[in-house]
């Protein structure tokens, strides 16, 4: 999203087609009891263009490389190439089975990173924008899990209506698509009585990385889901 804004700065009368998402079900072991139940597949396609009806946009991007191996797929790069051996599933200490070509996540480290670092980043961004939480209509965050978003909401001191966390039970965690999925799912309620909402978007995940954008979002001409049958193929 930030890169789209940067491109539009140099192309005033153009549009950017932003495509984001993942097929996580093909990257998570079916016997991974920690990650498999919340996994979802999704892709979001957004048309980004300049508007004369919105104000300044504030953004922040941060990374913590020390915790990079909290969420990663061990094999597939030059350090650990894919071989017959990397495709063999093994059981970890918690009873989860996965191979080196599948997603491995240390949930406790990721949770602590989200809960400790995200509120700080959001507060810093609002200070930069000279804004207060009461003036922000919605906090649309990456939908990692219901529990994580509930705790993040408590740390931020905002209501359930302002920071929804109901996406994972319906669509699953679809990685980078969860923010547009959340926006689309709640679109009719969010814009029922308003044509513009002030929204804080916040994302966190692999890297470990954080990103936030504070902006005015106008009512879209088109915002819909298109559902496709899910393949049961195990890749």
List each model region and its residues:
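Flexible, glycine-rich active-site loops centered on histidine and acidic residues
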Residues: 5, 9-43
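Condensing-enzyme catalytic core mediating Claisen C-C bond formation in acyl metabolism
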Residues: 32-112, 116, 120, 216-235
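Internal helical hairpin/lid segments
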Residues: 106-110, 119-147
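Acidic, glycine-rich active-site loops and adjacent beta-strand->loop/helix elements
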Residues: 20-26, 62-64, 170, 203-208
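Structural motif
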Residues: 14-17, 44-46, 55, 198-199
